[in-house]
Amino acid sequence: MTEFIPAGTLYHALPSPFPMKRGGVLHQARVAYETWGTLAADRSNAILIVTGLSPNAHAAANQANPEPGWWEAMLGPGKPIDTARWFVVCVNSLGSCKGSTGPASVNPDTGAPYRLSFPDLSIEDVADAAADVVHALGIAQLACLIGNSMGGMTALALLLRHPGIARSHINISGSAQALPFSIAIRSLQREAIRLDPHWNGGHYDDVRYPESGMRMARKLGVITYRSALEWDGRFGRVRLDSEQAADDPFGLEFQVESYLEGHARRFVRFFDPNCYLYLSRSMDWFDLAEYVEERPVAGSAIDNARADARPASAKPQTGVSTADTVLAGLARIRIARALAIGANTDILFPVQQQEQIADGLRAGGADAQFIGLDSPQGHDAFLVDFARFGPAVSDFLQDC
């Protein structure tokens, strides 16, 4: 069980006990975060970034850690998210292995890693933990809440469960619910990990580690993070040189196979498998349509107590999830301005889901805009296609 924490990481201690949406509590839990820029005296210039499944809080270089971050081209002085103007906070998701408390963390009640004793994790838990960081920094209202990929889900949950926490919102390649295709892919990824004998019911170590399962899970993910258009343009049917090809008659032969293998091997030892399982499943469970019907969902006493403390519009409900109920759930969110952006080639979070977000927020009274970008790079476009995503984000923030 390993955590992978960047230098310069800051920590916020969550209330103890910290109740989880689906039952159970965390004791002495923490959230990892980093900051950029200077908070204005009136605390009106704060932006919060909530991330996808795998990133840490190190979105860009800063004084505490000058190493480039995972969103380096988007965040910094003079960049689309201009830290000469904005005070930016990026949090690592609760449940991760990159600083925030998760299955790889030590359970203070036992002195051993949580592993599978970690409570069921929901996107709402990730959102509530992020909101607690915002409040601890003395920020009453964010100028903008930015969420990408899984972070788009987290952002919507945050806005719904913590009304008034942000004046504006940018949702990048996110969604208001998990679609069947995405659920199916993630279920296969989790199955690949759990079928690796070294996973051993979550009890692995650095010597006996489910590397094969993690490698297969990552390959499946990478295939969905990009598009067929990009695969064709980058690799075609080009074969490896004879000295690069595997001797195994069913081994690596094409360049695209080699790319997937290399990408997977670079990932598998830098993300904890149990954390991967928990975060992956939290996305499958997320559905804003739960917040629409009138009859509350049955839950634990802790869950119900926490839900009772929130506005009625922010309590999960029962009912069949349809396009109409998702839109109705989105319409419960109160935000002044919003931008939903996606790539037209995204198969994991299809661009129609970002359009749905804009439609739903608009129904709730927001000045909401949708932009579908013609990027060939699929779901991961927001991480690489800065020529398209950068101006869209920059233009929106100009008026915040």
Curated annotation (Swiss-Prot):
Record region (Important for substrate specificity): 52-55
EC class name: transferase
Active site (record annotation): 149, 346, 379
Residues where substrate binds: 218, 380
Presence of the UniProt keyword Signal in the record: no
Domain AB hydrolase-1 positions: 45-385
Superkingdom as given in the UniProt entry: Bacteria
One GO CC term on file: cytoplasm
E.C. number: 2.3.1.-
Site (Important for acyl-CoA specificity): 186
Xref: Pfam families: Abhydrolase_1
Gene3D superfamilies assigned: alpha/beta hydrolase
Catalytic activity: succinyl-CoA + L-serine = O-succinyl-L-serine + CoA
Molecular-function annotations in GO: homoserine O-acetyltransferase activity; L-serine O-succinyltransferase activity
A biological-process GO annotation: methionine biosynthetic process
Pathway(s) per entry: Amino-acid biosynthesis; L-cysteine biosynthesis; L-cysteine from L-serine: step 1/2
Compartments it resides in: Cytoplasm
Family: Belongs to the AB hydrolase superfamily. MetX family.
Entry protein name: Serine O-succinyltransferase
Organism: Xanthomonas axonopodis pv. citri (strain 306)
Lineage, uppermost ranks: Bacteria, Pseudomonadati, Pseudomonadota, Gammaproteobacteria, Lysobacterales
